[in-house]
Regions:
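Flexible "arm" and connector segments at domain edges
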Residues: 1-111
Length: 111
C-alpha cells in the first residue's frame, strides 16, 4: 500500500466535513498530539516494569499515521509527497547515514 492509497482509504473515517479544512486541520493536529501521548504512555510503562506490548504499539502508531493523513488531507498534501520530501531531506542531511557531526553541523536553513 502506498501512502496515497492509505490516505484515500482513511478519508472515509474523517468526521469533519471535507469543506471544513481548518477544522479538519485542528482535529488532526490535536489528535496527533493525543496519539503521540498514547505512544509515549506505552514506553513510560516500561519504567513501571511492564514490557512494551507490540500489538498495542502497532495500533497506536496506526492512529498516529491516521492523524498525519488527516492533516495532509486538510492541507491538500499527498502523503506520498510528504514521505518523499522527508527521505530527501534526510539523505541530504545524512548522505552516509546518521552521524552526530552532521547533526550538529547542519546547512544553513536546514529544518
Amino acid at each position: 500500500m502506498t501512502g496515497n492509497e492509505y490516505q484515500e482509504l482513511s478519508k472515509r473515517t474523517i468526521a469533519t466535513p471535507m469543506d471544513k479544512k481548518e477544522e479538519m486541520l485542528n482535529h488532526g493536529v490535536f489528535g496527533l498530539t493525543a496519539e503521540a501521548g498514547e505512544v509515549s504512555s506505552l514506553l513510560q510503562k516500561v519504567y513501571q516494569g511492564r514490557p512494551i506490548d507490540p500489538v498495542h504499539m502497532k495500533k497506536e502508531l496506526g492512529d498516529v499515521l491516521w492523524m498525519v493523513a488527516e492533516i495532509c488531507t486538510a492541507m491538500g498534501f499527498e502523503l506520498d509527497e510528504i514521505m518523499q520530501l522527508n527521505v530527501d531531506k534526510l539523505k541530504a542531511r545524512f548522505p552516509n547515514g546518521f552521524t552526530v557531526e552532521n547533526d550538529l553541523n547542519r546547512a544553513k536553513g536546514d529544518i
